[in-house]
């Protein structure tokens, strides 16, 4: 079984093909604490051990391990998150080959060539032995690595002339990856990566504001509040101190403005593109501003309804 994995810092996205040809996708959030969860009743608990450390999935714990940093790519918790995604995907536990990702700043060196040291480091990370208390884990046999951003434009690029180019803007939890790719995937004109700019800029601001509203929680909770930021009933349900909701929304909106402006400033480094595509978990937050800033007409601007799956779908189309 070959499984394509976009192992982003906020969520793990999987895509694979069943034996009957059906294409399946699965998403699993990254929210793990360094201790085992308490078992109760029939509810399945995922308690892992890796390198002598205990981990468990916990979507609400404020003590969840921070994954929005570049070190995440080679960390133990990355391995835990990928195995957890596999175990919750519905796939039978077995041996699998995987294709995973690295941000552009990690996949390429300063000369825009594949960074073999980082790529091998990423592969080696998945050779670590992990155990599941009371259960079996997948055995990862072969590991291949693709760069982020670029594969997401595969379908669009096949339809473009070789003199056209697609600007692919991939805003994730930790990084902003931008690539300018020639039509038919005939070449890559320019790449850019910022490992310090991602949706985590907003997540951190929301978490800090939530603490003031007596709602200390995980990054997963903060991200869910960002997603439902326009739903007042949801905010009242999630935020303990109703009188402090405005503090949370003001902090969130200010962080969103900063994120948007930093992305737009980066886009000024690119020129000559004919089409634009916005992908990643942060696509919804910036797509309108990007479209206005680039002044690309409607039929040349691409933003799917499932932006989080764009990268893993492109990986699947290229590698399957």
Swiss-Prot record:
Keywords: Plasmid, Plasmid partition
GO MF terms, alphabetically ordered: identical protein binding
This protein's record includes keyword Lipid metabolism: no
UniProt-listed SUPFAM superfamilies: Actin-like ATPase domain
Lineage top rank: taxon: Bacteria
GO biological process: plasmid partitioning
Pfam family, one: StbA_N
InterPro entries reported in the protein's UniProt record: ASKHA_NBD_ParM_R1-like (IPR056367), ATPase_NBD (IPR043129), ParM/StbA_N (IPR009440), ParM_C (IPR048345)
Description of how the protein assembles with itself and partners: Homopolymerizes into double helical protofilaments with a longitudinal repeat similar to filamentous actin.
Family: Belongs to the plasmid partition ParM family.
Biological function: Involved in the control of plasmid partition. Required for the accurate segregation of the plasmid.
Name of protein: Plasmid segregation protein ParM
Organism expressing this protein natively: Escherichia coli
Gene that this sequence comes from: parM
């Amino acid at each position: 079984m070959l499984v394509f994995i976009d192992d982003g810092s906020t969520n793990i996205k999987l895509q694979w093909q069943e034996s009957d040809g059906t294409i399946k996708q699965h998403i699993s959030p990254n929210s793990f604490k360094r201790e085992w969860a308490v078992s109760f009743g029939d509810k399945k608990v995922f308690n892992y051990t890796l390198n002598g450390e205990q981990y468990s999935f916990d979507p609400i714990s404020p003590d969840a391990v921070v994954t929005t940093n570049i070190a995440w790519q080679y960390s133990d918790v990355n391995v835990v998150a990928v195995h957890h995604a596999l175990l919750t995907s519905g796939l039978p536990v077995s041996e699998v080959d995987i294709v995973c990702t690295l941000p552009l700043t990690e996949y390429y060196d300063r000369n825009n060539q594949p960074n073999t040291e980082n790529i091998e480091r990423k592969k080696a990370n998945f050779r670590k032995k992990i155990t599941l208390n009371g259960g079996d884990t997948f055995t990862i046999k072969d590991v291949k690595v693709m760069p982020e951003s670029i594969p997401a434009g595969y379908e669009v690029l096949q339809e473009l002339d070789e003199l056209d180019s697609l600007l692919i803007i991939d805003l994730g939890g930790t990084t902003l990856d931008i690539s300018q790719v020639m039509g038919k995937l005939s070449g890559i004109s320019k790449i850019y990566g910022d490992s310090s700019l991602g949706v985590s800029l907003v997540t951190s601001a929301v978490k800090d504001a939530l603490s003031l509203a007596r709602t200390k929680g995980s990054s997963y909770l903060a991200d869910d509040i960002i997603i439902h930021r326009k739903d007042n009933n949801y905010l009242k349900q999630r935020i303990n101190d109703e009188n402090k909701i405005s503090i949370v929304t003001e902090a969130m909106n200010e962080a969103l403005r900063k994120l948007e402006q930093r992305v737009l400033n980066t886009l000024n480094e690119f020129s000559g593109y004919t089409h634009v595509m916005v992908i990643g978990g942060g696509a919804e937050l910036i797509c309108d501003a990007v479209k206005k800033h680039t002044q690309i007409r409607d039929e040349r601007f691409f933003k799917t309804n499932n932006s989080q799956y764009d990268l893993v779908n492109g990986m699947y189309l290229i590698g399957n």
